[in-house]
Amino acid sequence: MIDLRLLREDPDRVRASQRARGEDVGLVDALLSADELRRSSGVRFDELRAEQRSLGKLIPKATPEERTELLKKAEQLKADVKAADAAQDEAAADAKRLLLQLGNIVHEDVPVGGEEDFVVLETHGTIRDFGAEGFEPKDHLELGEALGAIDMERGAKVSGSRFYYLTGVGALLELALVNAAIAQATEAGFVPMLTPALVRPRAMEGTGFLGQAAENVYHLEKDDYYLVGTSEVPLAAYHMDEIIDADKLPLRYAGFSPCFRREAGTYGKDTRGIFRVHQFDKVEMFSYVDPADAEAEHRRLLDWEKQWLTALELPFQVIDVATGDLGSSASRKFDCEAWIPTQGKYRELTSASNCDGFQARRLSVRMREGKKVQPLATLNGTLCAVPRTIVAILENHQLPDGSVRVPEMLRPYLGGREVLEPVAK
């Protein structure tokens, strides 16, 4: 959530942020009114409690005649205090409900617009000219089936659409990618973690994945648990309700977990293959930092993502994601998009988001510097979303005979194998 002081002192900035996101600007004024009511309700309750305490001191000293009148007044005050307490709680709940609907304040440099209004910041690598090489590229599913690496048919038979099996070299390729990603993260100073896939509502809400994003989340209603769509959720909640000494920052974690996404609203998109699926594995970087270091850490996360994609020898571009595509928690987001030859365009492989103090406030994660205690900043960045990375590797490193060259960086994790070859049918 945003800092309420900012809302009170500069509501126009909050309105501008909501407008840039394409969200309801009226929410700002509703929240201002609710916040004022919450504060005035609190003052009213405190005044009545003070009057009640003062009256309580007078009663023992009063004469019999005075005591009767004071006791009547005390009875009325008791009812008034109870009503004021209820009004205070109701006002606080209403203000919190509205506050949780408000997105983070967008960074001033973020391009304004929707999904297609991003700005390309960098391009890396060379896009292959398959025509000049004399063959038509196959898509990742055709390649994966020939390699004995991907089985969509049985995935659909067992679990339905957007499910799959990784088999043989496909399974080995996932394990190689995960181990290589964890190795890079560990070398960069991240603490590796295997995180829970089920979380309580507060963790999901605290990271901003309920509200508008709730339609893409799997909810186990009987137990009131949520399946995570990213290990960002359990990593952000790891230090929930804690105060961290400033001299221990930054704290960096690399989480590996299964991820579950309903993919609501994507009917008809990416229906072939494993680019958009309901379940996948991912290595995620997560940082807790001093707010003053948040922008620099954001660039560091992006640099680690670029290092990873460069090591995989993939052509990619870096984009500054537009305001309408940020998600509620991020103030700014950089995506790395790899070139997918058979689609003829760049597609998202990684995201790096600066959430400032937005998640930390919701989850009550704070830092202590001297006598000062304040929310810290949280940031997250994809290192390896496995299926999409496999898609990019298969398509960009395919050879004319349907085999796939293994990027040099991955070879030690695949027993030295240099080429993945089609299996005999």
Curated annotation (Swiss-Prot):
GO terms for molecular function: ATP binding; serine-tRNA ligase activity. L-serine binds at residues 230-232, 284, 382. Its main location: cytoplasm. Keywords: Aminoacyl-tRNA synthetase, ATP-binding, Cytoplasm, Ligase, Nucleotide-binding, Protein biosynthesis. It catalyses: tRNA(Ser) + L-serine + ATP = L-seryl-tRNA(Ser) + AMP + diphosphate + H(+); tRNA(Sec) + L-serine + ATP = L-seryl-tRNA(Sec) + AMP + diphosphate + H(+). It comes from the Bacteria. PROSITE patterns: AA_TRNA_LIGASE_II (PS50862). ATP binds at residues 261-263, 277, 348-351. Coiled coil: none annotated. Its EC number is 6.1.1.11. InterPro entries: aa-tRNA-synt_IIb, aa-tRNA-synth_II, aa-tRNA-synth_II/BPL/LPL, Ser-tRNA-ligase_type_1, Ser-tRNA-synth_1_N, SerRS_1_N_sf, SerRS_core, tRNA-bd_arm. Catalyzes the attachment of serine to tRNA(Ser). Is also able to aminoacylate tRNA(Sec) with serine, to form the misacylated tRNA L-seryl-tRNA(Sec), which will be further converted into selenocysteinyl-tRNA(Sec). Homodimer. The tRNA molecule binds across the dimer. Consists of two distinct domains, a catalytic core and a N-terminal extension that is involved in tRNA binding. This is Serine--tRNA ligase. It comes from Streptomyces griseus subsp. griseus (strain JCM 4626 / CBS 651.72 / NBRC 13350 / KCC S-0626 / ISP 5235).
